[in-house]
Design a protein with these regions (language model features):
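Residue-level detector of functionally pivotal "anchor" positions at catalytic/ligand-binding pockets or at interdomain
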Residues: 1-9, 111, 279-302, 317, ...
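N-terminal capping/linker segments that flank leucine-rich repeat
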Residues: 1-43, 260-285
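Hydrophobic anchor residues at the C-terminal helix/turn of individual leucine-rich repeat
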Residues: 10, 35-37, 60-61, 84-85, ...
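Conserved hydrophobic beta-strand positions in leucine-rich repeat
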Residues: 17-22, 45-47, 69-71, 93-95, ...
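The feature encodes a structural signal of leucine-rich repeats
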Residues: 32-36, 53-58, 80-82, 104-106, ...
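Glycine-centered coil/turn sites that cap beta-strands in beta-rich domains
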Residues: 287-302, 306-327, 336-339, 348-351, ...
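C-terminal tail/sorting-segment detector
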Residues: 344, 348-350, 359-385
Length: 385
């Protein structure tokens, strides 16, 4: 069949489906050969630890059958080409340890099949496991904020954006990625508070691989060395971490040190707070006064899923007439949990999975809503039995 020459080796255009590390690439090679992008049947492309530099050519978009793309640990620079966002079959994308700059192209968040996977290998020297990361853009010089479109990566098991110059608050959509097992946002310039919706990430337990006598740990949650501030929500204690293990931060990979978080901390974090810059905490205490919310809000119920009781929390910045109502998915009223005037403050009400007649309801998805003044908000919760 027709072939091309790459680095002194002949590759069939039709039959070459994998080009993996380590292909023999001379140190003198500093750019991708144009012929590489004619291997349109490639499903795996892994080129690492070379002297290849400069931008990734837009012709990378020709390789539409790629499932794994790993170009980590090279000298690549410039902006990440948006054409990578057209490689819709990708389940693993690793561009870490290069010199990429600019913002993360929003097109990457259209790669809805990204997830990451563990590959198990057997051989005469024993077994081993390799983790192909879902999305790894760490160790570059990326700037800007993380787009809300990141919430489209619903299958993602690992996300590593560490060691960049990313900034601004985290989008709420990030907390909807409930397939995540590893989240590393360390060593950036992220700001703002951590949302109580972090409690949705119920698979965030870290990933461990092994080879011979060694193991590699991919952090469960690493937020260290940023500019995060405010109070850490109690929902963080819902994460599937062994909080009773004094070495949990090492064994599972948990780190929130070197931020600007303020006390009081959730009880599960007592041993894992690390060093915090509390200079601005006094001002925050005065502003919040611990009793007066600044805005109306309705929190995610806790626990969720639940059986048989869950707590719904909400905040009232002023005295209000309040309705808190549970509905089924057809919009039928199930239970009126609150109906009347309430003073401002931090409020909560429990639902015991019964209707207005006191009868137990069936398992499933329910809606709960609050109406207070001109404020309206609705959330979902799951009853299991």
């Amino acid at each position: 069949t027709e072939g091309i020459d790459l680095w002194g080796e002949c590759y069939s255009i039709k039959n070459t489906t994998a080009l993996g590390w380590p292909p023999f690439i001379p140190d003198s090679v500093t750019s991708f050969p144009e012929e590489l992008f004619s291997l349109v049947n490639l499903t795996t492309l892994s080129i690492n630890y070379t002297n290849i530099s400069g931008a990734i050519p837009p012709q990378i978009g020709n390789l539409s059958n790629l499932i794994r793309l790993n170009l980590s640990s090279n000298y690549l620079s410039g902006e990440i080409p948006p054409e990578i966002g057209g490689l819709i079959n990708l389940i693993s994308l690793d561009l870490s340890s290069n010199h990429f700059s600019g913002e993360i192209p929003v097109e990457l968040f259209g790669l809805i099949n990204l997830k990451g996977e563990i590959e198990y290998i057997t051989g005469p020297g024993g077994g081993a496991s390799i983790f192909h990361q879902g999305l790894n853009l760490s160790n570059n010089t990326l700037t800007g904020s993380v787009s809300e479109e990141i919430g489209d990566l619903i299958n993602l098991k690992s996300l590593d954006l560490s060691f960049n110059q990313l900034e601004s608050d985290l989008p709420l959509e990030l907390y909807s990625l409930d397939s995540l097992r590893s989240l590393n946002l360390s060593n950036n310039l992220f700001t703002g508070e951590i949302s109580e919706e972090i409690g949705n990430l119920l698979k965030l337990e870290g990933i461990t691989t092994y080879a011979h006598m060694s193991t590699t740990q991919y952090d469960a949650l690493n937020l260290s060395n940023n500019l995060f501030s405010g109070f850490i929500p109690f929902e963080i204690c819902d994460l599937p971490l062994d909080w009773e293990d004094s070495y949990m931060d090492e064994n599972q990979g948990f780190n929130i040190s070197n931020n600007q978080f303020c006390a009081p901390f959730p009880p599960c974090l007592v041993s894992f707070v690390g060093t915090q810059d509390t200079y601005n905490c006094t001002q925050m205490y005065n502003q919040n006064n611990f009793n007066m919310p600044l805005n109306y809000s309705l929190s995610q119920n806790h626990p969720n899923p639940f059986n048989p009781i869950t707590t719904l929390r909400y905040e009232l910045p002023e005295d209000s007439f309040v309705d808190v109502t549970v509905y089924d998915m057809l919009g039928n009223v199930i239970n009126n949990l609150a109906h009347g005037n309430q003073n401002s403050g931090y409020k909560s009400v429990q639902w015991n999975a019964t209707n207005n007649q006191g009868q137990p309801v069936s398992a499933g998805v329910y809606l709960y809503s609050i109406e207070a003044g001109d404020f309206r908000q609705t959330r979902k919760m799951i009853l299991i039995k």
